[in-house]
Amino acid sequence: MTAQIQQLTSELTLERINEIPVLTLNHPVGSARIALQGAQLLNWQPKGAEQDIFWLSEIEPFTQGVAIRGGVPLCYPWFGGVKQPSHGTARLRLWKLSDYDLQANEVRLEFSLFSEYGVIEAKTKMEFTDKCTITLTHLGQEPAQAALHSYFNIGDISQIEVQNLPSSCYDSLQGKHTDVPSTRKIEQGVDCIYTLEEDKTFLVDKAFNRRIQITHHHADSIVLWNPWEKTPSAMKADGYRNMVCIETARLEKLLQFGESISAEISTLPADI
């Protein structure tokens, strides 16, 4: 159930989907939706694109305090299950839209995460042109991990390749480091953490006839994930066929106060 809360501009609307407030952008550069819970980009469809760049679960219930399955969750201030809740608290908390600027060829949205004492703990900036850039800035006193957990929308898992990856990774499913091809095809469940070598990763999608470029800024790791048939919560049994996660992460060299991590995402001519 969707209900309008506030019309901020002619191109920017605050709505509520079930229990979650969501910003909807309809602008000449493209369309996007951002959940205020987690400052989580849910969808982005740039001008002229036939398909959304990001995958969002068809059965996502939008329940407050429960992680949203899809888009670009912000895993922060820790990654994985080293503490609870898994992947940190930022994706479960409400952020505030603190600034926005809509120009003819560019949109900038900024979100702030406040502590219970009103102190800013983190900021997230999203910039939309023909590219989408997401920047998370750490403003906490303690060093932190972060990952931009991007779920990419794909035509069919059997028709993609992830290119320009390192040739070794830590395989979380096997619990060990292993050698892998630099170009990965996904034919079973995968959960690999790579030490960043090249700042660009490419997702080639034959079914959608497109190539997505992910440029990793101020990151030290890339995470490649697809659950295959071990379906997590809020995902259809065959949902794994239409998504793959390529995450921009800072896991080893912790973020210090004022440091940022960002992912720049663009579509390229389908050289496939």
Listing of model-derived features with the role each one plays in the protein:
Residues 1-28, 35, 112-116, 193-272:
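Beta-strand-rich recognition/accessory modules
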Residues 28-32, 40, 49-52, 118-120, ...:
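Short acidic/polar mixed-charge low-complexity motifs
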Residues 28-85:
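Acidic-aromatic substrate-binding/catalytic surfaces of carbohydrate-active enzymes
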Residues 84-129:
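Extended, loop-rich substrate-binding clefts of extracytoplasmic carbohydrate-active enzymes
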Residues 111-154:
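Acidic, contiguous internal or C-terminal segments within carbohydrate-active enzymes
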Residues 143, 151-222, 227:
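Active-site/ligand-binding surface loops and adjacent short beta/alpha elements
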